[in-house]
Amino acid sequence: MAGPGSLCCASRGASALLATALLYAALGDVVRSEQQIPLSVVKLWASAFGGEIKSIAAKYSGSQLLQKKYKEYEKDVAIEEIDGLQLVKKLAKIMEEMFHKKSEAVRRLVEAAEEAHLKHEFDADLQYEYFNAVLINERDKDGNFLELGKEFILAPNDHFNNLPVNISLSDVQVPTNMYNKDPAIVNGVYWSESLNKVFVDNFDRDPSLIWQYFGSAKGFFRQYPGIKWEPDENGVIAFDCRNRKWYIQAATSPKDVVILVDVSGSMKGLRLTIAKQTVSSILDTLGDDDFFNIITYNEELHYVEPCLNGTLVQADRTNKEHFREHLDKLFAKGIGMLDIALNEAFNILSDFNHTGQGSICSQAIMLITDGAVDTYDTIFAKYNWPDRKVRIFTYLIGREAAFADNLKWMACANKGFFTQISTLADVQENVMEYLHVLSRPKVIDQEHDVVWTEAYIDSTLPQAQKLADDQGLVLMTTVAMPVFSKQNETRSKGILLGVVGTDVPVKELLKTIPKYKLGIHGYAFAITNNGYILTHPELRPLYEEGKKRRKPNYSSVDLSEVEWEDRDDVLRNAMVNRKTGKFSMEVKKTVDKGKRVLVMTNDYYYTDIKGTPFSLGVALSRGHGKYFFRGNVTIEEGLHDLEHPDVSLADEWSYCNTDLHPEHRHLSQLEAIKLYLKGKEPLLQCDKELIQEVLFDAVVSAPIEAYWTSLALNKSENSDKGVEVAFLGTRTGLSRINLFVGAEQLTNQDFLKAGDKENIFNADHFPLWYRRAAEQIAGSFVYSIPFSTGTVNKSNVVTASTSIQLLDERKSPVVAAVGIQMKLEFFQRKFWTASRQCASLDGKCSISCDDETVNCYLIDNNGFILVSEDYTQTGDFFGEVEGAVMNKLLTMGSFKRITLYDYQAMCRANKESSDSAHGLLDPYKAFLSAAKWIMTELVLFLVEFNLCSWWHSDMTAKAQKLKQTLEPCDTEYPAFVSERTIKETTGNIACEDCSKSFVIQQIPSSNLFMVVVDSSCLCESVAPITMAPIEIRYNESLKCERLKAQKIRRRPESCHGFHPEENARECGGASSLQAQAALLLLPLVSSLFSR
């Protein structure tokens, strides 16, 4: 029997053995986690897969055949370096001529309108049945046409996107809050009827014209061609032509404005609500050439934005919205000291004028108050008399008229205007009065300035909603001119009759640009006198949240926000100043929804477009982008090869102008070219140089059709139907497509279709597969898959493409790109087959992708996963899956991080929102809100109630709640690019309790890398690397500096601030426009009955 000592020894021995075993186990773990993945084996896998997949891609794309065919013509082509300056000057001249045609059409409308008005005598009893755009073709319950709604023939027209229109007549829209048969409107409609024949004549002269119109100062809107207008779901048409930018810009000159708002105690409640709405309506009338500030006053002065104390700010969309947010914070208390406010306003206007930064034209003070106890003539005598350069516009808020005389005197003594605003319904009409006063000098001068708006999307018009393209609503600019009264007896009054205009879609500009001469990455762009983008391929005016919506600041995106690498604004400022020249810089251009980046050097060439406020620029990328070549084949040869059914041309490129004659509008570009070459349509105008190159490409690429057909017929060549599509595109926009499977069997049904904008030739870019192939080494293929493919079954494809160069040098133009699309499953199967190979004679591999200790990936040159054992990771960024390895690759220089900026981003923000609808937007809620208000404000109701104030009331408590909204913001985000010179890398990562090894090996002749990672060491202490954008948040002082900062801009060339003959006695009265009760009740009643 063993004693205690023996037991103790035995216990110690067991413990020692256990400790030894644990030590060996731990050492085993360390050894296993530090085991080196054999580079030679990974290199073998990469070589096997690379050879196999390139063989498939080259074979099915026909790349070698096409390269050979172009080489055969090498001696017969002439290579030219593109002269960027000459190109941009030529383009500017073409655009100048196009713009001039549009402005001449508008000028003819001006002459006709003024002549018609001169001959017309106002008749207060005039009875005239006109075509009301809302009522046309409407019948009553007995089947009779409604009054003003007689029969108006409408027919679909392909030039207007098959909208039903009447190209013989215009019709008239009257705002909902105005009386259709008001004598002023009936007389205006009557004499403006003579514009019909000019509308038709303009359209005959220039069939590319779209909407032509006359916006009357009385509020009605005459539009050609005539179209049916449909009210919104509340029975309302909110459109009023007088608050559109084109109207305001044409009617007035640039202005500096200080808005003074009385926030004394007497302004509480309804009055303050009306005052806020009045300020908001004034802001609506200010444009990018105007400057403003808002000051509130009681015993003290309060700048609505304290940061902008003592200065004015440009009235762009961002700044106006910033001030609107501050308006909601206003409250009334104390006593109003107007003298202090007036002194401050005059000093600001004087000081700002001396800086030379403002409009240097008209100046005005807008006073919004419920009364003034004095006329403050000593202040006006000190600052404004005798010249009266600052106009005073006074808005009396409320029904009380005790102090109306003082306010009216101020306005009349300072060439301004006085109005009284009793209800919210009065605001819009009364605010518009000041525009007509400011237009007087221009009218007396009889200066018909041509104005062009910035790019905008006018979704308030029903036809704009329907004239949408695949990308959303159409971006356009408007050319407009004012129409004046020429009657002698009204000359000194300077009566503005209205504004005429026509819209010019931005895509019309793009049609004039020869994309084939700009190279694969080249593009043209244009900006306004304020530096805002008119057209640029990087402009993104829409965002998606359920449906496509306009970004709030889309029309004021500055050139510096898309060409952000130009930190000193050298390019922008030169273009704003209408200079002609050249500028170069390295740029980082994103492709594929912004997730990939191409780093290149661009040469920019720029000049002005005469007769407009626009400047034009052209960007050419260095290297192959600066060269162009001319081939030569006979028309007979080329025409024969264009007849093949697999040939298509870029629909958005302008080979022939099919807009000039109505009979050509139905033609595709390919059909137009064929008719042109056959001489069957002598009226067709075509780009001879481009067509010659199209014929050359058609001839050279023709043999590939027979090649693809032979592959398709030999079913054994593609027995598992892995390869589905072969395609090619040339520098002239010519495409050929071949299907190796039936159309219904295609995995990606959208590929190369019209809706697949990224992968087809567009007005402003080459297909994505073409652009990426051009940046690859000649002879290699670029492979890609849609992002997050693992979650989207229909897109489980791999696209492979390669470029075709004419010469074996960097200066060679990239003449074409060819490629294939194959099933992702087929592609991945080839990868896994290759990764099972090994060089061991006994066939026993030291390592395999099937091993649990390793993870194998196939990633591209931007770090996106094409193959992973976890299928759901397909299309994800490698750094999100293997953060530690990606971090090491960045440290070692195998990949580099490139920081990018997005100044057009939309970020989520929490905002207070009201449950109360405003005005006519929701009659039912307006009714309930009004009822509550009537009960709680009975006394005020008895004194001030009328139908307008009842209709528009949301006077009292608004239920506030936090709501997530998308708002414009600036973001920063990374993109990643592999270092081409590094072909292979091995590495070890020291983690907390283990070491993680990996091997990365480039796949030959591709943009791909095989990455094999030791999976036994998780290395969870290293965070994933994400590509998610981060909002750039600015502190208060920086926000203030950004608000104050004003980029260089060019003022409009004309200014009509004053005229000595102006009759200042027309300065307003105390009456306010009352809307008709029945008219206002109609939408409410119909809304209530429909519920």
Curated annotation (Swiss-Prot):
It is found in: Membrane. The keyword rRNA processing does not apply. Glycans are attached at residues 166, 309, 553, 632. N-glycosylated. May be proteolytically processed into subunits alpha-2-3 and delta-3 that are disulfide-linked. It is however unclear whether such cleavage really takes place in vivo and has a functional role. Residues 452-549 form the Cache domain. CDD domains: PDC2_MCP_like (cd12912), vWA_VGCC_like (cd01463). GO terms for cellular component: GABA-ergic synapse; monoatomic ion channel complex; presynaptic active zone membrane. One of its GO terms (molecular function) is voltage-gated calcium channel activity. The chain crosses the membrane at residues 1069-1089. Residues 1-33 form the signal peptide. Brain-specific. Predominantly expressed in the caudate putamen, entorhinal complex, hippocampus and cortex. Disulfide bonds join 412-1055. One of its GO terms (biological process) is cellular response to insulin-like growth factor stimulus. PROSITE patterns: VWFA (PS50234). Keywords: Calcium, Calcium channel, Calcium transport, Disulfide bond, Glycoprotein, Ion channel, Ion transport, Membrane, Metal-binding, Phosphoprotein, Signal, Transmembrane, Transmembrane helix, Transport, Voltage-gated channel. The modification Phosphotyrosine is found at residue 924. Residues 256-438 form the VWFA domain. Residues 34-1068 are extracellular. A divalent metal cation binds at residues 262, 264, 266. Pfam families: VGCC_alpha2, VWA_3, VWA_N. The MIDAS-like motif in the VWFA domain binds divalent metal cations and is required to promote trafficking of the alpha-1 (CACNA1) subunit to the plasma membrane by an integrin-like switch. Dimer formed of alpha-2-2 and delta-2 chains; disulfide-linked. Voltage-dependent calcium channels are multisubunit complexes, consisting of alpha-1 (CACNA1), alpha-2 (CACNA2D), beta (CACNB) and delta (CACNA2D) subunits in a 1:1:1:1 ratio. Belongs to the calcium channel subunit alpha-2/delta family. The alpha-2/delta subunit of voltage-dependent calcium channels regulates calcium current density and activation/inactivation kinetics of the calcium channel. Acts as a regulatory subunit for P/Q-type calcium channel (CACNA1A), N-type (CACNA1B), L-type (CACNA1C OR CACNA1D) but not T-type (CACNA1G). In contrast to CACNA2D1 and CACNA2D2, it does not bind gabapentin, an antiepileptic drug. This is Voltage-dependent calcium channel subunit alpha-2/delta-3. It comes from Mus musculus (Mouse). The lineage of its organism: Eukaryota, Metazoa, Chordata, Craniata, Vertebrata. The gene is Cacna2d3.
